[in-house]
Amino acid sequence: MGNLVIGSRGSELALWQANHIKERLKKECLIESEIQIVKTKGDKILDTPLNKIGGKGLFTKELEELLLKGAIDLAVHSLKDVPVVFEKGLDLACITKRADVRDTFLSVKFPDLMSLPKGAKVGTTSLRRSMQIKLKRQDLDTESLRGNVQTRLKKLECGEFDAIILAEAGLCRLEIQGAKYRKAFSVEEMIPSMGQGALGVEMLKNHKHFATLQKLNDEKSAFCCRLEREFIKGLNGGCQIPIGVHASLMGDRVKIQAVLGLPNGKEVITKEKQGDKTKAFDLVQELLEEFLQSGAKEILEKAQLF
């Protein structure tokens, strides 16, 4: 039998992630594999903000189509990019141990967000980040920043932006120091995206190695990420809308923090729930109900106009 084929986007970070799974497959599952690079819609359209391109699965759809055809055996994703509803026959075979979940501030001239001058230009791909930046500093100018990690850093160094916000996990995986000033926000300062820091391996549910890949699953990370995905699912959300949600375990207790609002930092709802781990999914439903009662659906409809 030939090697398993891993589908991956072509960026340096995506290939790091695919190679990480390839190495673990060999070491922990005794399975040989090879990587096939796939360009997704999100990779091809680089001159438009992600939320303007439209549709879910901007970084996953082409990979899912190849999975369904049997052209690749598994697809490695940043879990935050994976839609919460799967194409029929597909599912996550595993969720890996989470890396650092935080978002990170980078700048050549300024040590942190609060030291930026009025009107400073902050680059981010994410409406979620833009919303939380504007909530703290309404006077800042948040602008779309596309491209891979290195491209974004180059734009910062060339002076196109006064600061940019990137995921700490990506910087750590690529061993990038970044700019002169680098400061991670706490989860309380900026609630991450669902699944941020984790990798999701997607396969056909009837693939003969689907169960085998459970060996790569991290139970604690998977539990927390599934709670976050359940919250997003309840709001009909995706990764291109201004919602942050983070679940964490502290012994037998779970804490779920969430934020939702307009990208301009207006009409923001922030709530959290804590309780027994055994009641975790009930807590998600309670949190959802509170958000819906506070007008979450209406706010998300308005957010589509940005």
From Swiss-Prot:
Leftover remarks: The porphobilinogen subunits are added to the dipyrromethane group.
Protein name: Porphobilinogen deaminase
One matching Pfam family: Porphobil_deam
Keywords: Porphyrin biosynthesis, Transferase
Names of the cofactor(s): dipyrromethane
Record's keyword annotation contains Transferase: yes
Summary of subunit composition and partner proteins: Monomer.
Enzyme class: transferase
GO molecular function, one term: hydroxymethylbilane synthase activity
Source organism: Helicobacter pylori (strain ATCC 700392 / 26695)
Protein's GO biological process: heme biosynthetic process; protoporphyrinogen IX biosynthetic process
UniProt cross-references to Gene3D superfamilies, sorted A to Z: Periplasmic binding protein-like II, Porphobilinogen deaminase, C-terminal domain
Cofactor: record remark: Binds 1 dipyrromethane group covalently.
Record InterPro entries: HemC, Porphobilin_deaminase_cofac_BS, Porphobilin_deaminase_N, Porphobilinogen_deaminase_C, Porphobilinogen_deaminase_C_sf
Modified residues (S-(dipyrrolylmethanemethyl)cysteine): 239
Family, per entry: Belongs to the HMBS family.
EC number from the UniProt entry: 2.5.1.61
Function: Tetrapolymerization of the monopyrrole PBG into the hydroxymethylbilane pre-uroporphyrinogen in several discrete steps.
